[in-house]
């Protein structure tokens, strides 16, 4: 049963959506000659609340997962890290669907007429809805995930869906795409739901936190960090702090794992850091922030300060290739060190252009470290200081592209494209190229 605070939060959301947002959307009259919105109109499909707002009441229903209720605050950004901050929140990436929904309501080219739209946004909280299939009573019915949505799309104004066979539809799924890729024919069911395996959804675009090795429907977008500035001065103030921060440590690993005896990249990192710290008494070469058991998930203070003090942030794959810490590190101006392309280079092509990776990151193949004796320390120390400075500046330049600014931001900050803006641009380009 939802807590009292959750019910209060939901009441605020209902008030916001039905008494504030709806008139704003309808007041945006369409002009066929509006050059700024040519090929950029988006229609937000009106879905029954069971597909979005009602799902928020399940925020504490699954004991095996974290209680998401506290992180519904501030339209999904979570509670502030402290009362006086204007930019830092305890954000849970699983609420990206809610964050994106709130932000797209500010998109300047919304149209109430689906026939004029280049893209149709489905405000369906697929990741939150998937919890009942992953951890709840519908565990053995995971192949049904999406059937209710499909039935609605094909029965309520079916011409919107059928006009382009779903090619112009997109949604956000705040989990790795693997979690929605269980084959429909597997019996007994394995991990995940079958949403992306449904033939009817093959044409839509899904914005996920991580894509598969052979993405067709999905495109990975950055994990939300805890940094959500609301004005340009706050962003510029943070960038100044990042630039003047003293980088007293060569490299940092913030994460868990690596404690098993079997060879893997996280174990190699831990062993190298332990060895370095045992022999170095003056210069700090390797810093380690233990984030085991999820203790860092909603506490950015644990890792942001060490990231600000490090030149390089190690980003080894874990249970899945991608890491939220990649984007935490970029926000801190910490140069990412990758050990396989699937961690970022092959994932976030809209936000981190593949052709520019060498300008702001270092790649060391994990096989070289685990099996061939390559020391990470040696590779990083061989990079000239001037090159490190230049790379850090490129990381800082990338910062706005991977951050999610706060809803209701100032016009000055809105002129800088953030992760949502770039995702929308990518979706529109993708749809236009396909239809």
UniProtKB/Swiss-Prot annotation:
Keyword check for Aminoacyl-tRNA synthetase:
no
Task: Summarize the protein's role.
Answer: Functions in xyloglucan synthesis by adding side chains to the xylosylated glucan backbone. Involved in the galactosylation of hemicellulose xyloglucan.
Q: Which residues cross the membrane?
A: 7-23
Group of enzyme by EC:
transferase
Taken from the UniProt entry, a GO cellular component term is: Golgi membrane
Any one GO MF annotation of this record: glycosyltransferase activity
- What is the similarity comment for this entry? Belongs to the glycosyltransferase 47 family.
UniProt topology in membrane: Single-pass type II membrane protein
Q: What is this protein called?
A: Probable xyloglucan galactosyltransferase GT19
The record's tissue-specificity note reads: Expressed in roots, hypocotyls, cotyledons, leaves, stems, stamens and pollen grains.
Membrane side Cytoplasmic: residue ranges: 1-6
Instruction: Cite the entry's keywords alphabetically.
Output: Glycoprotein, Glycosyltransferase, Golgi apparatus, Membrane, Signal-anchor, Transferase, Transmembrane, Transmembrane helix
Pfam families from the entry? Exostosin_GT47
| InterPro entries on file | Exostosin, Exostosin_GT47
Tell me the Gene Ontology biological-process terms attached to this UniProt entry: protein glycosylation
From the Swiss-Prot or TrEMBL record, state where the protein is found. Golgi apparatus membrane
Residue ranges in the Lumenal topological domain are: 24-435
Question: What EC number is given for this enzyme?
Answer: 2.4.1.-
**Which of this chain's residues carry glycans?**
140, 203, 277
